[in-house]
Amino acid sequence: KSAVANLMLSGGTTGFPKLAPLEYEQLYVYANAFSEKCNMNEDTKYLAILPIPHKFAFCSPGILGTLLKGGTVIVCDDVNYDSVFKIIEREKVNITSVVPSLLKIWIEVLEWDNSYNLTSLQVLQVGGAPLENRIAEKACELLKCKIQQLYGATESVVCCTDLSDSIETICSCQGKPLLPEDEIKIVDDSGVEVLPGKTGEILAKGPY
């Protein structure tokens, strides 16, 4: 269980492309905890829109989390909004993951085109970049589903909002650490923890 299971692409803290080794136990603990967080079960239908080699679509909870709970994974090979919306409508997709730039296009389309039936969608995860408050609010209004924000690194701890959080909370933060054992603090250049509201470097440690 401590053997390397996957070499996952990451920009890490430097932005320079690299491969991050993830172990079997790490992937299982992470995907299982996230699937519980998203209330996944055998009725879950997850649409993989983003690149599968990325941690977001692969196991946040993504493909791995869905399969752990006995759900169904639908893989999308075209991110064009029309193709995606038709798959959601046809397959009755109830959870998927996007980046803010993609969600912005969805909102722009849905503001003038209400011909798509997206009522099956219950959870929309958004991560990879900051999410504008206006886009988050519009997404809740037009898609009528729960928005979940994510923030984290391929190599380490991830934070996310709860499905029960208010729209105000979802728009103002990236949530809390996924696991109770996760530790996160912000330090200055000397490694000393900074006060709330101050800028610093994020340090994170998890149980895997």
How should each PLM-predicted stretch be described?
Residues 1, 18-21, 48, 71-78, ...:
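Short beta-strand->loop structural element characteristic of the AMP-binding/adenylate-forming
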Residues 1-9, 16, 39-45:
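Conserved pre-ATP/AMP-binding loop-to-beta segment of ANL
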Residues 5-29:
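Conserved AMP-binding A3 loop
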Residues 28-45, 55-95, 109, 181:
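Conserved AMP-binding/adenylation subdomain of ANL enzymes
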Residues 80, 102-103, 131:
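Alpha-helix capping/helix-boundary segments
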Residues 93-98, 107-170, 183:
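Gly/Ser/Thr-rich phosphate-binding loop
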Residues 170, 185-204:
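Conserved beta-loop-beta connector loops within the AMP-binding
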